[in-house]
From Swiss-Prot:
Sugar-bearing residue positions: 95, 204, 282
One Gene Ontology term, aspect cellular component: extracellular matrix
Subcellular location: Secreted
Assembly and binders: Homodimer.
Protein name: HSF-like protein
SUPFAM superfamilies xref list: Cystatin/monellin
Organism encoding this protein: Protobothrops flavoviridis
Residues forming coiled coils: none
Cytoplasm found in the keyword field: no
Length: 324
């Protein structure tokens, strides 16, 4: 499965408390370079509409571009890896586990341009990314029994998620949930099963109202205990053409602490009312936003006058996790 997703983001990060200092030559391994690259990674994670947060893996290319004398322009080509934290999870990406390679990891290559105004400390950030899962052949060669990634809208994945959700709703007296997003589906053998990851949201309906086509149910979009991230396994055959009825399953759901005003609260609005599957690796998202960035002490290179702007030496940088 070698399809691609294009994630196109355009925005402005404003940091009134950002400070900078003139520093020595920077390459793809210096702390100053990584500080600037982290601005791009932070921006991607704050505005990604689907799926999972991304962690920096390799700074592949770093260029200093021409400027008008008032700004410093950085261009990066970054290799990122998918973590196990959903974008609605408030856990800082630094504390998120990178998805292991044998669990069909996904990488993202991003072109990031940061235009830093040295008088106002404003950063304009331009990002374009493409995402690719690891090779099925390589995974099966190294781990024949490991689960293989499927499209989130695969019929077996969708049916299995709905089956688990119905089982949850049967047990939760007074609380009814619906699927907010199917973010991951995998198939494995020995024993044959479907591994699922999805987000659910509580709705303001009874069980009877939820099954009434004429009754409009509305999800709670903020507050305590209304949104949860679930990891489930449904043991069923890929050859089965019927929807699951009494299959054995395992499931664990964790409440997400998503509050009104949280950086991702607007993403809930994006999903609500649109039974959603993560777009996987073949869609485009755009946004124009402003958000504050925390205090960062960043180095600014002294030489930014080269109009041909070749990549700096010392690139690509170190691999922080692994290469797909």
């Amino acid at each position: 499965m070698n399809s691609l997703v294009a994630l196109v983001l355009l925005g402005q990060i404003i940091g009134s408390t950002v400070s900078f200092q003139l520093g020595p030559n920077m390459d793809c391994n210096t702390k100053g370079t990584k500080d600037w690259a982290d601005i791009g990674v932070h921006y991607i994670n704050e505005h990604k509409l689907h799926g999972y947060k991304q962690a920096l893996n390799v700074i592949k290319i770093f260029r200093l571009l021409p400027s008008d004398g008032r700004s410093v322009i950085f261009h990066f080509n970054l290799n990122l890896l998918e973590t196990e934290c959903h974008v609605l999870d408030s856990t800082p990406v630094e504390n998120c586990t990178v998805r292991p390679q044998h669990n069909h990891a996904v990488e993202m290559d991003c072109n990031v341009r940061i235009i830093h105004d040295i008088t106002t400390f404003e950063d304009e950030v331009f990002v374009k990314c493409s995402s690719t899962p690891g090779s099925v052949e390589n995974i099966l060669r190294d781990c024949p029994k490991c689960p293989i990634l499927l499209s989130p809208n695969d019929p077996h994945v969708v049916d299995s998620v709905e089956y688990v959700l119905n089982k949850h709703n049967e047990k939760l007296s007074g609380h009814i949930y619906e699927v907010l997003e199917i973010s991951r589906g995998q198939h494995k053998y020995e024993p044959e099963a479907y591994y699922l990851e999805f987000v659910i949201v509580e709705i303001n309906c009874t069980a009877q109202e939820a099954h009434d086509d004429y009754h409009q149910c509305h999800p709670y979009t903020a507050g305590e205990d209304h949104i949860a991230f679930c990891r489930s396994t449904v043991f069923r055959s890929h050859a089965s053409l019927e929807k699951p009825k009494d299959e054995k399953f395992e499931s664990d759901c964790v409440i997400l602490d998503v509050k009104e005003g949280h950086a991702h609260s607007h993403l809930i609005e994006h999903h609500v009312g649109k039974y959603s599957t993560s777009p996987g690796y073949n869609s485009t998202d755009e946004c124009v936003v402003e958000c504050p960035v925390a205090f960062v002490n960043k180095e600014v290179p002294t030489d930014i006058s080269d109009h041909n702007t070749p990549p700096v030496k010392g690139c690509p940088g170190r691999v922080l996790h692994f290469q797909l």
